[in-house]
Design a protein with these regions (language model features):
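Active-site-adjacent structural elements that line small-molecule/cofactor binding pockets in enzymes
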Residues: 1-266
Length: 266
């Protein structure tokens, strides 16, 4: 299903991660509909093969097959994974999958990607877990391969697919963010983001990218009310706030309050 991007974007955007666990797919599909109707800007899932919380053997669905369905179901929101594990797919294949979902959605895919961390996924699906260092090195090698594949594809992506990289390692991960990302998803509180944002900009200067203006800062705000932290987020330069919710109920009450706060910013 094609969609048309809005002519302008709000100062801060709101994303929700619908964790594909402990729910039937009908419940997930309904949550996507409700989230888009609420006015969120981005709907994410995640890229795991088992639940991360609750019953470790509970119901769960795969990331990219789901994104293809969301691309058809939705009309306005951007969609993506928060985040895809680089280890699970050859970079060229991942580029092709992303390009395909980009076309299905009419140019609304964000490629969220990270180095990977959840060992059970690796062990049960036959991937080599390695070490944090080897997984980060693999991510660094994958990013130019993904972009090179996009440049070679026929048809090309409908747009320059935005790349979101998740992680906060100050020496290696933030260097990869500086080199390749359009969005950086940080973990932790506002002060952590502010400090690491400065480090990111140092990496940006080293590689010749103005990351202060070219890389949107994203931060999770689970359990936090906009009236409590919203002003600090704006002061820190956050451009995307994300919230997460799990099945089977997919409670969007806090998400709705953040959408109202976003709209009040003008």
């Amino acid at each position: 299903m094609t969609g048309t991007a809005a002519p302008s974007q709000p100062r801060v955007r709101v994303g929700v991660q619908l964790q594909p666990q402990h729910a039937g797919y009908g419940q997930i599909r309904d949550a996507v509909l409700r989230a888009e109707d609420l006015g969120v800007d981005v709907i994410f899932n995640w890229d795991h093969f088992f639940p991360l919380y609750g019953d470790p053997d509970g119901r769960h669905f795969e990331c990219w097959t789901m994104l293809g369905a969301w691309a058809e179901q939705t009309e306005r929101v951007e969609i993506g994974a928060l985040v895809t594990c680089n280890s699970y797919r050859n970079p060229e294949l991942l580029a092709d999958m992303a390009r395909t979902v980009d076309h299905i959605s009419g140019g609304r895919l964000i490629l969220g990607i990270g180095a990977g961390w959840f060992q059970r996924d690796y062990d049960e699906y036959g991937y080599e877990f390695g070490t944090p260092g080897t997984r980060i090195a693999d991510l660094a090698q994958a990013m130019p391969r993904i972009r090179a594949r996009w440049a070679a594809m026929n048809p090309a992506p409908t747009r320059d697919i935005p790349v979101m990289i998740g992680g906060g390692g100050e020496r290696k991960t933030l260097r990869i963010v500086a080199e390749h990302a359009d969005v950086w998803h940080s973990f932790g509180d506002v002060e952590t983001l502010r400090r690491k944002s400065g480090i990111l900009d140092e990496h940006g200067a080293a590689v010749g990218r103005d990351t202060a203006s070219l890389v949107t800062r994203s931060l999770g705000v689970d359990g936090q009310e906009p009236g409590e932290v919203g002003a600090d987020l704006l002061a820190a330069g956050v451009g995307l706030v994300t919230l997460s919710t799990s099945g089977p109920d997919y409670d969007l009450g806090l998400v709705e309050r953040w959408v109202r706060w976003r709209d009040a910013q003008g």
